[in-house]
Curated annotation (Swiss-Prot):
Native source species: Shewanella oneidensis (strain ATCC 700550 / JCM 31522 / CIP 106686 / LMG 19005 / NCIMB 14063 / MR-1)
Protein's name in the database: Cytidylate kinase
EC code(s) of this entry: 2.7.4.25
Main location: cytoplasm
Subcellular location: Cytoplasm
Top-level taxon: Bacteria
An example Gene Ontology biological process: pyrimidine nucleotide metabolic process
Gene Ontology cellular component terms for the protein in this record: cytosol
Keyword annotations from UniProtKB, A to Z: ATP-binding, Cytoplasm, Kinase, Nucleotide-binding, Transferase
Protein residues bound to ATP: 12-20
Catalytic activity as recorded in UniProt: CMP + ATP = CDP + ADP; dCMP + ATP = dCDP + ADP
Cross-referenced InterPro entries: Cytidylate_kin (IPR003136), Cytidylate_kinase_dom (IPR011994), P-loop_NTPase (IPR027417)
Family the UniProt entry places it in: Belongs to the cytidylate kinase family. Type 1 subfamily.
Amino acid sequence: MSERAPVVTIDGPSGAGKGTISQLLAKHLGWQLLDSGAIYRVLALAAIHHDVELENEESITLLASHLDVKFLTGNEKDPVQVILEGEDVTTAIRTQECSNAASKVAAFPRVREALLRRQRAFRTAPGLIADGRDMGTVVFPTASAKLYLTASAQERAQRRYNQLQDKGFDVNIERLLAEIIERDDRDMNRPVAPLVPAENALVIDTSDKGIDEVLELALNYINQKLSSTN
């Protein structure tokens, strides 16, 4: 890890636009990309591929320490492309089996510690865009610039509804809204690493803003922060 490599953290709730803005920033700046929300799913899939028992904390921790994963800028359908051991697993990590397995491996404290170190190892030159929920508060507390994207629960539910409809899923928007509100409450009130803006983060409400406007706000802020540290 290079402590000198700049890192920009982008935190916020699901559906606020973190994934889209993160990959656009990474592409624009030519920086590395970290999608921390996918990392437990990637680890779970690696365990399944290597026939590692999900209940074996020692084996899962070892796997986490050497996890061969890359995040690449993708396209409009999948903003972030996830590569595990050279294989595109962007779709594979979204299965229910993988989701259930991710919940199991995430319960181990040693696994969480190993993945924390693994995430910090993404901080390499020329820089890193880190997308998540506790990037600016826990993983990279000394980040060069910190952003927190948010939007109303109704707007985020509508975005998720449109996204799933485009992929051919039959979904209920009221159920999506209820799930988002429930997850917000859980994430914001959990005792460890609650979902809150970092103390010195720029908060951007994306509810009534287009992608280009949010990107411009983010870039202006990042450039300002980077120029003040040089």
